[in-house]
């Protein structure tokens, strides 16, 4: 039996917003499994907002580079330990160079990106520059993830303050439409282009939660089945791009807009700084003490 510590309870409470005793009980029932405890709280209706479960305090920036012909795009998340460093000019210059070189060389994974020359004919690599930056700034700097998109139509992008970045590929050259759709993806965070592309794992997980809540009503099985089916259908519309109301014209669904424009979204990618990354929390006094000790 796993010992449930106050730190575990604190983390679960921060990630779900549920009451302390509810968090402790959920951890006990799941033998300390944090993700299982989150699901248990959601089924019981104790989590205030499921979206909080994925939020973290990791810092950094999302950088994007687009080719001149708008046929290719490259995006990277570069992380730092603090927001202060994330706004540092040297850090930003490095991050921008990562995007520039990644686009130029057509890489699509972190290892290949780190191995790239920092300049076309340089013997120094991006990894060399990263290490030098760590020594210069005094914080751990990492290229967490990279991605690329290409299209014979157009690749558009949107960046929201360097915290959220989107690449989106259309099958037709429509720069205005692709920009609006990229902005929409940044704001609404759809999981897939269409409902039938939403992962089965996600659907089944949500279905279990809907079923658990519906069963608490005490209604007949056939009614519960209809309730769950309706909730799943509603969810699929909410999490798929084509089923969402367009951010610039809420009266129109994205799917209807695409039909009217005779366009198709081939793919999209959305990065948000710190998604899914756990960061050790420290209070201000601890940070000051750590800096003092580090300067001895």
UniProtKB/Swiss-Prot annotation:
Q: Where in the cell is it found?
A: Cytoplasm
What keywords are assigned to this protein?
A: Cytoplasm, Elongation factor, Protein biosynthesis
Annotated region described as Involved in Mg(2+) ion dislocation from EF-Tu, given as residue ranges: 82-85
Q: Looking at the UniProt record for this protein, which Gene Ontology cellular component terms does it annotate, in alphabetical order?
A: cytoplasm
> Where is it chiefly localized?
cytoplasm
Does Cytoplasm appear among the keywords?
yes
Recorded GO molecular functions are: translation elongation factor activity
Record PANTHER family: ELONGATION FACTOR TS, ELONGATION FACTOR TS, MITOCHONDRIAL
What does the function comment of this entry state?
Associates with the EF-Tu.GDP complex and induces the exchange of GDP to GTP. It remains bound to the aminoacyl-tRNA.EF-Tu.GTP complex up to the GTP hydrolysis stage on the ribosome.
- What family is this? Belongs to the EF-Ts family.
Q: Which HAMAP family match?
A: EF_Ts (MF_00050)
What is the designated name of this protein?
Answer: Elongation factor Ts
Q: Record the organism.
A: Coxiella burnetii (strain CbuK_Q154) (Coxiella burnetii (strain Q154))
Lineage of the native species? Bacteria, Pseudomonadati, Pseudomonadota, Gammaproteobacteria, Legionellales
